[in-house]
C-alpha cells in the first residue's frame, strides 16, 4: 500500500505525462462509444423506416452481411449451402 500511495504523490513530469495520456485515451474511447451508440440508433431507425416502406428487414440484414464478405468466400458459402439443401431434399 505504501508504494501505491507514493505513486499517487509522485508529481514528476513523466508521471504527469502518463496520467494525462491515460486520461486522453479514456476520454477518446468514451467519445467514440457515444458516437457508436448514436450510429447504432441511426441504423435501427433506417431499418424501421425500410420496414415501414414494405421491405423485409431480415433480407436487408442478410444482404448487408453478404456485401461485407469477400466474393470468393461468399460464393463458397453459397455453394456449400446449396449442396446441403440438395442433400436434404430442400431444393
UniProtKB/Swiss-Prot annotation:
Pfam family, one: GapR_DNA-bd
Protein name in UniProt: UPF0335 protein BRADO1188
Gene source species: Bradyrhizobium sp. (strain ORS 278)
Molecular-function annotations in GO: DNA binding
Family as reported in the entry's similarity comment: Belongs to the UPF0335 family.
Coiled-coil region(s): none
Signal peptide (UniProt feature, chain positions): none
InterPro entries: GapR-like, GapR-like_DNA-bd
Amino acid at each position: 500500500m505504501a508504494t501505491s500511495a507514493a505513486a499517487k504523490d509522485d508529481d514528476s513530469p513523466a508521471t504527469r505525462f502518463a496520467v494525462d495520456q491515460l486520461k486522453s485515451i479514456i476520454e477518446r474511447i468514451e467519445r467514440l462509444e457515444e458516437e457508436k451508440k448514436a450510429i447504432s440508433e441511426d441504423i435501427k431507425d433506417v431499418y424501421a423506416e425500410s420496414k415501414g416502406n414494405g421491405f423485409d428487414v431480415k433480407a436487408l440484414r442478410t444482404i448487408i452481411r453478404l456485401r461485407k464478405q469477400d466474393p470468393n468466400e461468399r460464393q463458397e458459402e453459397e455453394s456449400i449451402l446449396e449442396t446441403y439443401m440438395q442433400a436434404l431434399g430442400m431444393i
